[in-house]
Regions:
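Amphipathic alpha-helical scaffolding segments
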Residues: 127, 180-183, 257, 347-352, ...
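The core hydrophobic/aromatic register in alpha-helical repeat solenoids, strongest
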Residues: 209, 392-395, 450-453, 457
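Catalytic cores of carbohydrate-active enzymes
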Residues: 426-432, 436-439, 445-487
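Glycine- and aromatic-rich loop/turn segments at beta-sheet edges
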Residues: 300-317, 355-374, 420-435, 481-487
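An acidic intrinsically disordered interaction segment
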Residues: 283-302, 346-359, 480
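Aromatic-rich carbohydrate-recognition surfaces in CAZymes
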Residues: 320-426, 440-443, 447
Length: 487
């Protein structure tokens, strides 16, 4: 089978427009504390701040107001998420928290040492699934102007966090360390729509705390175990001793009750992407490729009913689910790294295809972006339906085995039949909405689907390829006159 390079393919197909999301801070970007924001900076001389042994008041906000995400550090290893602000403390505001499968397992995780909260110095992404926070403290009574302790926190999307205290003091420090925890076990959809749940009451559980609600249970365990655990305040407490230059660490693990650790799809031998390296005069090309593949691996999900089929999710952090057009475009762009993602995406979407009589037969349903009862679902199926035969045809060119192509060919034929039926005797494919506009990008998708779909039909002895090419040529001829606008 001839191999074609993506660079030689016409670029008349563009990824579909996704929801407007706030930009996410990229890994490696240092963050300085902001003076216009309460980030736990010391409020008393000597760096003294509020202790976390008292539950902080809920931050007031307008009901239904969408929480901001433009400054958040978002760690992704689906189905796990960890969303943090720059200071590293989880305060229960907005989207902050640790999530699994769309449920917030931990919304509050505030560290204090000897009653003081660390002063934020740096926050950055270190991988797609991890963020690192650095802060400083002045804890010794006779400390000078320089901090005598550095606090490092590394938070992962799988629900683990490691906190390390490093002393630069010249004498031994004996200090209480407190971590205040809390959660509402709310669904991400409710939180994203500005309606989080009330904070739940904790109970002491093993080496940590546990929360329960009608929808589930979550627990946090600590290693080493705390000296004291106070359920009423949601507080874990240690009494530590640090010699000069010494360090102390604790690891927190957040889990759904009864669930094991998150097993991500794209790690190690399970990755659908073949090893690749970038050869370029640009020094950053290799790092860019590596980072891009890692980001894609973090967004991989399995079809729950067919675990061998994988696809890419879209919509982080607001929702992390299957958006057909986005998944098909992304799978097409990764064809140089293998066809496993493409075939998994196609199989998953083929199982959702609408069948039976009616004008919608053959459609690949769009993303049902259901955020619970608060935000209505939206469904845009046209682009996904047009992209399905395109991806199948191009995956075949990139070496998808013939038996797998033949398995998916009936679904591609139904997509093309929907296109023929919807266009009818006309020249263009109209918008899915009644009396909707004729979008130029939709015509680009339809033109490519007709041409590559015709190649598929011809290759497997199906009829209809000639008619698809004739219609594509008619549309191409008429398009400049109908869509071109002169200044």
């Amino acid at each position: 089978m001839p191999m074609t390079s993506p660079s030689s393919a016409p670029d008349d197909i563009r990824p579909s427009a996704t929801d407007t999301a706030q930009p996410v801070r990229r890994r490696g970007d240092p963050v300085a504390p902001r003076a216009d924001r309460d980030i736990g900076a010391p409020s008393l001389p000597g760096g003294r701040g509020p202790t976390t042994s008292q539950k902080p008041p809920r931050v007031p906000g307008r009901t239904g107001e969408l929480p901001p995400a433009h400054t958040a550090l978002i760690c992704v290893a689906l189905p796990g998420l960890a969303i943090s602000e720059e200071e590293g403390q989880l305060n229960g505001r907005g989207l902050e928290g640790v999530y699994r499968a769309g449920r917030r397992l931990l919304s509050r995780c505030r560290l204090s040492v000897a009653g003081r909260e660390p002063l934020p110095v740096q926050a950055r992404m270190v991988a797609a699934d991890a963020a690192r926070f650095v802060g400083t403290l002045r804890v010794a009574p006779d400390a000078g102007p320089d901090p005598d302790m550095v606090v490092e926190r590394t938070r992962h999307a799988d629900g683990t966090e490691r906190i390390t205290l490093r002393s630069s003091s010249l004498r031994t420090l004996r200090l209480p360390v407190e971590i205040a925890l809390g959660t509402d076990l709310a669904e991400l959809g409710s939180i994203a729509s500005g309606r989080p749940g009330p904070e739940l009451t904790a109970s002491v559980h093993a080496a940590g705390l546990r929360w329960s609600s009608a929808t589930g249970h979550a627990a946090v365990t600590a290693d080493p175990p705390p000296t004291d655990a106070l359920a009423s305040a949601g507080l874990l407490r240690w009494e530590i001793e640090l010699p000069p230059g010494g360090a102390w660490s604790v690891e927190l693990r957040v889990r759904l009750d009864g669930a094991g650790p998150i097993r991500t799809v794209g790690r190690g031998a399970a990755s659908p992407f073949a090893p690749a390296r970038a050869v370029s005069d640009r020094l950053g090309a290799e790092a860019l490729l590596r980072t891009s593949v890692e980001d894609l691996q973090a967004l991989l999900l399995r079809d729950p009913r067919h675990p061998t089929d994988i696809h890419l999710a879209a919509g982080a952090p607001w929702r992390c689910g299957l958006a057909p057009a986005d998944a098909l475009v992304a799978a097409r762009m990764t064809l140089p790294l293998g066809t496993r993602l493409a075939v998994g995406t196609l199989r998953t979407l083929a199982r959702t295809q609408l069948t039976g009589p009616g004008p919608r037969a053959g459609l690949i349903p769009g993303p049902l972006r259901d955020a619970g009862p608060h935000l209505p679902p939206s469904c845009t199926a046209t682009e996904g339906t047009l992209l399905f035969p395109v991806l199948l045809a191009e995956a075949r060119r990139w070496g998808l085995p013939e038996p797998e192509v033949e398995e998916l060919l009936p679904a591609a034929e139904r997509c093309l039949e929907w296109l023929r039926t919807t266009v009818g005797d006309g020249t263009y494919l109209s918008d899915a909405q009644p009396n909707g506009p004729l979008r130029c990008e939709t015509q680009a998708h339809a033109h490519r689907a007709a041409l590559l779909g015709a190649d598929l039909l011809d290759a497997y002895g199906r009829t209809g390829g000639l008619g698809m090419r004739q219609w594509a040529q008619e549309m191409r001829t008429a398009f400049p006159d109908d869509f071109w606008a002169d200044d």
